[in-house]
Structures are given as structure tokens and as C-alpha cells.
Regions:
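Protease-domain processing segments flanking chymotrypsin-fold serine proteases, especially trypsin-like
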Residues: 2-15, 20-69, 78, 84-87, ...
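A cross-kingdom C-terminal cell-surface attachment/processing module
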Residues: 398-415
């Protein structure tokens, strides 16, 4: 059995704020100094449907009819319920269709570091990449990941990229744009320009005053004529000040992406907050995109209860749900870290362990006289039962669920 961890909200807040106390120049991305453009078919805006309103907070890239590639830090404070993707949309303020996201796969290295560092002042942005699965395949054209994966393929100050996003348009990220923008940036090497150490997971671009990505552009694409080169990851607190931004180097993760797109997966991380005295069920999708049926066994969690809606054998292309109960009965402004694991047995006798985490936060009871329904609610969410079409708030969207807690992530380019 797992040992659930209980920590104060102050500690988790400190763990997310602290990295910027010693690296004040290290945060988010939005397009500054760019131009309005027609959205390519593969451009994605990611957001959540909350209180009858959809707010986008990150970008992404459609790399397959079923899959969107984005940054891991875009989903570390998210819940699967209500997550949607607007694909190929030029202006988010206008009515547009959106696709329901039914699976979140955060890179294991990033997830493990994030969970391990909760409540501390340690941050690790290695492998800042994640995959989102679409419930309904997109008919839009996709963007292939560049096959240029060697440092010798790029020339500092000469190789040119294009960054895309709906995020902030001024250095302090106080203004944002519902219109898709792009900006041209030049390659600045593989050395982390913040810690001055070589990195294998990031590429750096920009370095020109007045041109940069910024908050709200996180997860969005960095491209060249060969395809997708980077995923917007981090940059300076103030954008476009002449410091190059960090982009997760997509070609390095080609094998990881291919593996996850063709195997068994579980929604491997969610964050949910709930007023004291309430409870909910948080749904985790188990998705089989492998060519074979798998046997599911060894269900284990340290959460108060587990509702298993999965069959013993999960067929190729099938999915099912596991629901973890979250009782907000601990001290307000504290959280528990719950873990969930299952084993997937393959026809050849090998076993694949699937691990997931839940950061469950108890908040204070609302001051208003109205009550909030406790009941149970599945992770599928009331807005994820069908494809939706509506306009959103302008720009990178609102801070959304618990994003005040996760504000430093906005500096990393998430709104």
C-alpha cells in the first residue's frame, strides 16, 4: 500500500514559487513582437470548461489524428474533467469547435520529479513534455516531428524557427491576444542559458529584444521547415528582454512519443481542489492503443476508495475508467498526495506497471450561504460528453482552477 502524504498548502505553494526566488529571470512564454497569422491545421489551444466558460491556458501541436503534444507543466495543475482542445483556430474570441481530451500522459521523469519535489524549493524541468489523447480523432492535418535530432543540425545565430501562440503580447504579460500570433526566433544552442549547463532535453531560441514567447504560449510549437522542433517550456519573468527561451527538444522524445501512442496508458497525474466537508470521485482513463488485448490486475491505491469500472481484459482501442475517491476532510489549505497503480499483462507474458498521482487539496468552506454539492462527480465532467463549439475568453485565458497556487508555472509560459 502507498503512504499518502499530507502537506500544507503553504509548502506546496512554496515549492512552486521558490524556483523563481533564485531565478527571477525564469518563467513563461507568450508571443511578443510577432504577427497575426492564419492558424495552421495543427495548431492547438488547450483549456478547461469551468463555470460554463472555456478558458485556454496553454498551446499544443496536433502530431497525430488522436494526439496533441504539449508541455508537462501545462497539465501538472489540471484535472482531466472538462479539458478540451481547440484545433486550427485563428481567433479564439470567435465561435469555434473544440475536441474533448480523454487522456493525459505526463512524461514519467517530469511527473516523478514534480511529485518528489512537492513541498520543497526544488524544481526540475527535465522532460517537460506531455501527450493528450483526443476522444474523437481530428480530421485536421498534423505536423510531423523534425527528424533533425543532432546538435550539428543547427547553427547558432543562423538556424531559424517560428514560435506560435495565443499568449501574452507585452513583456509583463498583462495583455494577451485571442488571435494566433507567430514570431521568428534564431537558434541559441543546447546550453541552458539560465544555469549555463548543457542540457539534452531543451533547445534554446530567441535572444533578441522585443521578440519572444511568453505566458500562455507554454506547450505551443517551435517549428522550422522540417517540422516540430520544440515545445515552449520556460523563459524570463519579463518576456522579450533579449534572453533566449527554453523549448523542450521534441526530436529527442520521438521514441517516447511513439511508445505512448502505441501502448497501454493511464491518466498519470491530476490536481483537484475541493471545499472542506465535500467529496468527489476523480476519474482516471485506462487506454489501450496497443495492437493486443491486455489483462488488468493488481489495482492499488492509498486513496480512501477505488471504484473499478474496467473489465478484466481491455481490447485494442478500448478504454475504461478507474475512479479514486477524494474526501476533503483534512485541514483546509493542506493537500494529500495519493498514488494509484495497476498492472497490464500482455499476451507474451510481460507486465507493464501503470502509475498515477493525485494532488488532492482541501480548501476553506465558501463564505456564502449557498451550498456546494458534495455528491460524487466523475472525471469525465459534464462538458466532456460531447464535442463543443463556443467562443472563449480572449488571450491566454483566465488563471482557472487553482492557478493562483500554480502562478509561477504561468511564468513558465502557462496562464
Amino acid at each position: 500500500m502507498f503512504d499518502a502524504k499530507i502537506k500544507t498548502l503553504a509548502l506546496i505553494t512554496m515549492s512552486l514559487l521558490a524556483p523563481y526566488s533564485y531565478a527571477q529571470e525564469r518563467p513563461t512564454h507568450r508571443i511578443v513582437g510577432g504577427s497575426a497569422v492564419q492558424a495552421p491545421s495543427w495548431m492547438v489551444a488547450i483549456g478547461n470548461h469551468v463555470d460554463n466558460k472555456w478558458d485556454n491556458y496553454c498551446g499544443g501541436t496536433l502530431i497525430d489524428k488522436d494526439w496533441v503534444l504539449t508541455a508537462a507543466h501545462c497539465v501538472e495543475g489540471s484535472r482531466l474533467s472538462g479539458m478540451q482542445a481547440a484545433i486550427g483556430v485563428t481567433d479564439l474570441s470567435k465561435r469555434h469547435p473544440r475536441s474533448v481530451v480523454d487522456q493525459i500522459i505526463m512524461h514519467e521523469t517530469y511527473r516523478n520529479n514534480f511529485v518528489q519535489n512537492l513541498g520543497s524549493n526544488v524544481e526540475d524541468i527535465e522532460s517537460d513534455i506531455a501527450l493528450l489523447h483526443l476522444r474523437t480523432p481530428s480530421t485536421n492535418g498534423v505536423l510531423a516531428i523534425s527528424d533533425r535530432d543532432s546538435t550539428s543540425d543547427y547553427q547558432k545565430g543562423r538556424s531559424e524557427f517560428t514560435a506560435w501562440g495565443y499568449g501574452g503580447i507585452d513583456p509583463d504579460a498583462t495583455l494577451s491576444s485571442p488571435q494566433l500570433l507567430s514570431v521568428n526566433l534564431t537558434f541559441q544552442g543546447f546550453k541552458d542559458l539560465w544555469t549555463f549547463t548543457p542540457t539534452q532535453t531543451h533547445i534554446f531560441a530567441g535572444g533578441v529584444v522585443g521578440k519572444d514567447t511568453c505566458q500562455g504560449d507554454s506547450g505551443g510549437p517551435l517549428t522550422d521547415q522540417h517540422g516540430l522542433v520544440g515545445v515552449t517550456s520556460y523563459g524570463g519573468n519579463r518576456c522579450a528582454t533579449g534572453q533566449a527561451g527554453g523549448y523542450t527538444f521534441a526530436p529527442m522524445f520521438r521514441d517516447w512519443i511513439a511508445e505512448k501512442m502505441n501502448s497501454v496508458s493511464i491518466t498519470n497525474h491530476q490536481l483537484v481542489s475541493l471545499p472542506a466537508g465535500q467529496h468527489t470521485w476523480v476519474s482516471y482513463t485506462v487506454l489501450n492503443t496497443s495492437p493486443d488485448s491486455v489483462t488488468l490486475e493488481g489495482f492499488n491505491t492509498d486513496a480512501p476508495a477505488l471504484l473499478n469500472e474496467c473489465p478484466n481484459s481491455l481490447a485494442p482501442g478500448a478504454k475504461c475508467n478507474l475512479k479514486v475517491r477524494f474526501d476533503a476532510n483534512f485541514t483546509p489549505d493542506t493537500y494529500k498526495l495519493y498514488k494509484l497503480s495497476i498492472n497490464a499483462l500482455k499476451p507474451n507474458g510481460s507486465s507493464q506497471r501503470l502509475d498515477a498521482s493525485l494532488v488532492a487539496i482541501t480548501t476553506k468552506k465558501p463564505d456564502t450561504g449557498s451550498s456546494i454539492g458534495g455528491g460524487s462527480s466523475s472525471g469525465s465532467g459534464s462538458h466532456s460528453s460531447s464535442e463543443s463549439s463556443s467562443s472563449s475568453s480572449s488571450g491566454g485565458g483566465s488563471l482557472g482552477l487553482f492557478s493562483l497556487l500554480l502562478l509561477p508555472l504561468a511564468w513558465r509560459r502557462k496562464l
